[in-house]
Amino acid sequence: MKKYLITGCAGFIGSNFVHYTLKKYPEILLVNLDKLTYAGNLENLKDVEGDPRHVFVQGDICDKELVESLFAKYDFDYVINFAAESHVDRSIKNPEIFVQSNVMGTVNLLQRAKEAWYDADAKTWKEGKKYLQVSTDEVYGALGAEGFFMETTPLCPHSPYSSSKASADMFVMAFHDTYGMPINITRCSNNYGPYQFPEKLIPLMINNVKHHKQLPVYGDGMQIRDWLYVEDHCKAIDMVCNGGKVGEVYNVGGHNERPNIFIVKTIIEQLHDRLKDDGISEDLIKHVADRLGHDRRYGIDPTKIKNDLGWYPETPFEKGIVLTIDWYLDHEEWMEHITSGNYQKYYEEMYKNK
């Protein structure tokens, strides 16, 4: 039975991966470590609470003693690191938190894995072990009107968030190059789907449209992103973890490039038609001052993972956005719990003066 340490399991992508993996593998053990910061919510894991294949541990990936004790207790086969502060606006306001969680947390996980998996006397690594770092296409910087990010594209991050993720990626690769640690890195495009914290574009717009709130759109809204349905991403991570060549980076993209303003207008149209609400219209859109250092376009070339592992994005955007809207409409109580308290304060601070 394979044993995984999953960090950031109560967040958006991490919780979707937990659901995906438990559904796919009848014999597996997931030890899920999450600090439960603002974006980590145990309600995301409510459906698997009683599953004996799932063990939840509340804690910080920076906690050396805790992580050490988990390796000693469970002898993990795989570590998949989803844990990260991930919102660019928050990183601009408070970059130190991103360095601590995204860089120092990653280094702590690498160190503890090295101690547990490397036999210093034999100078060999235990068989069947792997560390997988879940990263982002933002580490590459911005693209022009044409072309795509390749795995060989130089790292050129532009925000404190993407800089912290690029730093973490470089530490992961350094542990491979220096010590021979068995690692992979995946770099994905913009994810969307169930359980996403509503500071991100799609759930934010769905929630605001429903309540006739203004829809803040940065600049002209023509920033282009490649949209990847989260279940497709989970499948890619699973395939890389179990079949990826050690030491390799794999780009994971959706082949769904869309401008942000198109996303917003699509959500307006979908909810107007479904809810039969004339208060839902493009009049809700409010263009606000553009984000500092806002990259204009991202685009991923996933040819390598397709050729090496047979992965491809199965969910076109037109289908994925319908599935996503359906999920949020069916989980209003989840959204109400998420958007109470500290979130409201944060939302006002981010957008009230723009």
Kindly give the residue locations of the regions a language model identified.
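Residue-level signature of the cytosolic catalytic core of signaling kinases
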Residues: N41, G50, A145, P194-P198, ...
